[in-house]
Amino acid sequence: MAPAADSPTLQPAQPSDLNQYRGYDHVHWYVGNAKQAATYYVTRMGFERVAYRGLETGSKAVASHVVRNGNITFILTSPLRSVEQASRFPEDEALLKEIHAHLERHGDGVKDVAFEVDCVESVFSAAVRNGAEVVSDVRTVEDEDGQIKMATIRTYGETTHTLIERSGYRGGFMPGYRMESNADATSKFLPKVVLERIDHCVGNQDWDEMERVCDYYEKILGFHRFWSVDDKDICTEFSALKSIVMASPNDIVKMPINEPAKGKKQSQIEEYVDFYNGAGVQHIALRTNNIIDAITNLKARGTEFIKVPETYYEDMKIRLKRQGLVLDEDFETLKSLDILIDFDENGYLLQLFTKHLMDRPTVFIEIIQRNNFSGFGAGNFRALFEAIEREQALRGTLI
């Protein structure tokens, strides 16, 4: 079973605020080559191209490719011009400089995690009253399909949250983008990957920063502490971490916040902060209703996942028998796919993590299936840490 979660008593959110958050709208990445990055998600992970912004749509300084699988939407944005040329494009000058600076400092990574809300003005004004650092005020973008309201605030590191209100828009994505309808030519040859939505999005912090960041989510966005574990629960022979899951008032949006803890060697959190050059999004968990099909088809498409040792499943079989828990899925199939299992008295969770998506050991993806289980796989953290430490050893960063 998973370690017990720490659930501090907090003041309840105001009833009027409980249903403000509708979920994750999209995740916005800054990357060196958006077209190639989009191709990765299309061919490796079964996403579809849904929208585009670039030279052909009148955007002369930046290009964005939008891909989607289920209700999971990624925007991948790259600069089209050098920093030296930025002054030639006054409308995009600040954005162009920001993207270049982000890529220089962090490499490819997540810039913005956008939330869909019922009323931007309400959530944004409350955040500002409570001390939010404003990146951009409430603004409206529109086209023939209606209008979208949005505003952006800063969170940890250089990451931001954009609040988006879509009630007045009937288009496929967002004004300023051209919709894409042609299926990728490879899709008819590759197995379909069915994903549902973003389950959670994890942020890594530097030493002793977790509590400050969690306090920020509580104060600025009205989030609460949903679940937590400390270094006694999440440790190996060499390293450890602490984690607190922050959730929106209605528990629709969940943002786990990690920080390193003392250990004999450098942990994966320290490695991330070192290579990312600061705090940022470590991984995005994508929910599926059939993880066996999803992992089977992702592997067939060439997605690389961590390897889980045989001993994990020997121990898990004993634990499941002791608990009297019978999985709906075939245990040997889960084992053959390296899928991790965690459970409590109410249900169970199945999960697996990709290897890092970039050469820098920073961002990766989690595939997750929940069966009446609201935790975050704390029972698997040791196995996950050990698997990542084996990768760290190969990179020479387990020091």
Curated annotation (Swiss-Prot):
Enzymatic reactions: 3-(4-hydroxyphenyl)pyruvate + O2 = homogentisate + CO2
Gene3D superfamilies in alphabetical order: 2,3-Dihydroxybiphenyl 1,2-Dioxygenase, domain 1
Its UniProt pathway annotation is:
Amino-acid degradation; L-phenylalanine degradation; acetoacetate and fumarate from L-phenylalanine: step 3/6
Q: State how the cofactor is bound.
A: Binds 1 Fe cation per subunit.
Query: Which InterPro entries does the UniProt entry name for this protein?
Result: 4OHPhenylPyrv_dOase (IPR005956), 4OHPhenylPyrv_dOase_C (IPR041735), 4OHPhenylPyrv_dOase_N (IPR041736), Glyas_Bleomycin-R_OHBP_Dase (IPR029068), Glyas_Fos-R_dOase_dom (IPR004360), VOC (IPR037523)
Q: Which residues form the VOC domain?
A: 23-166, 197-355
Its domain of life reads: Eukaryota
Keywords (A to Z) from UniProt: Dioxygenase, Iron, Metal-binding, Oxidoreductase, Phenylalanine catabolism, Repeat, Tyrosine catabolism
GO BP annotations listed: L-phenylalanine catabolic process; tyrosine catabolic process
Locate the residues binding Fe cation. Answer: 200, 283, 366
One matching Pfam family is Glyoxalase
Look up keyword Oxidoreductase and say if it applies.
yes
For this protein, the record's NCBIfam families field holds:
4HPPD
Membership in a protein family: Belongs to the 4HPPD family.
PANTHER family attached to this UniProt entry: 4-HYDROXYPHENYLPYRUVATE DIOXYGENASE
The identity of this protein, by name, is 4-hydroxyphenylpyruvate dioxygenase
Source organism (scientific name): Coccidioides posadasii (strain RMSCC 757 / Silveira) (Valley fever fungus)
- The gene behind this protein is TCRP
